[in-house]
Amino acid sequence: MTMKPYDRACRSDFLKARDRIGGWLAEAPLRHAPNLELGGVAGQLLVSGEPEFHYGEIAGYWLSWAALYAPNSNLMTAVVNWLDRQWSGPYPAATRVGVRSDWRNQGVFSFDLAIIMRGLADAAPFVGEAGCGRVAARIAGWLDRMVGADGRLNPWLVLDSVAFPDRWSTRRGPYQIKTSAALLGAPNGWVPNRILQAAEETIDAWSARVDEQLEWHARLYAMEGLARVRPDQRAKIGFDNAVGYLPEQVGSSRGRSRADIQAQALRLLCLDPCASDTICLQFADVVLAHVSLHGAVRFWPDDETANVWCAIFAHQALDWWIYQKGVGGIRKPDSRELI
């Protein structure tokens, strides 16, 4: 079958956007700012291009992305060394480094620690296992304190008595399947058996209850975790053609498009052999609308800041979609590589 001129142009747009994001991710998240240390990975960049804050979880995501798409031992070593410094003290690193008033800095998330652990594991072949394993051992010590009395992982370790919000990220829920999957994939000896057992128990508790997660971002995390550890149980994405994208809340028909949610959905659809090509294209178009001319990815379509984790998810999503279409994808969709 001959590809129509529109199809060729459309797929060229996806390819160019993928490459712009990749170029942006290889440099922009590691930019230096006067109040932040070298080697940290930004969670978000201001309109000026300076990092707004450094984010350990996003450092983990970035290491996993770099290992797959842009391995650079010097840059990856700098990030691992930053994590080493952040986790060398008697208390956990701040969740958002450089932000004083963020409630997230009152505690530590097991999800974040698992993503950092995954990033260190992915970086180890490029920068050496000794340094990565040293940071992982420190993180494991804090994860051990997050095993609940029932043997399952707790989501949040409180470090400060100041009140914190009741949100999905501070409650147990199906999204913890992704936490557990990351820990179970760590190299032998990195994660103590007590934590690994807690990860297994957590998956058992939530694997049949994904529909109880009522926020799409978190539900897609749960589905990503299942895709890695129990692909036969992977839930289907409920898509509303009238909306054209997934809103923040499951079942809602209101709200704006969030880049991370749309990219997460597209990645999972690329792993589903029964997914509609039309629906995949709809998601790819929505993701594309969040990409700037410079390769930055906006959290909201009209946002002027640049979000790093949205860029990481969007880059992988567009790459997988391009691969499916046979027009220059770098990596074949693989649930084991879900970032």
What are these language model-derived features?
Residues 1-97, 134-152, 185, 281-282, ...:
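Low-complexity, Ser/Thr/Pro/Gly-enriched N-terminal "stalk/linker" regions
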Residues 2-4, 51-70, 76, 106-125, ...:
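Well-ordered alpha-helical segments within folded domains of soluble proteins
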Residues 25, 83, 120, 143-144, ...:
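Buried hydrophobic core positions in alpha-solenoid tandem helical repeats
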Residues 72, 126, 189, 232, ...:
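Alpha-solenoid helical repeat scaffolds
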Residues 96-103, 160-166, 205-209, 245-252:
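Acidic/His metal-coordination segments adjacent to aromatic residues that form catalytic metal sites
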Residues 98-118, 133, 137-169:
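Asp-box/WD-like beta-propeller blade repeats and closely related beta-sheet repeat scaffolds
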Residues 142-211:
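Solenoidal tandem-repeat scaffolds enriched in leucines and small polar residues
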Residues 205-215, 232-305, 332-339:
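Non-catalytic carbohydrate-binding regions of carbohydrate-active enzymes
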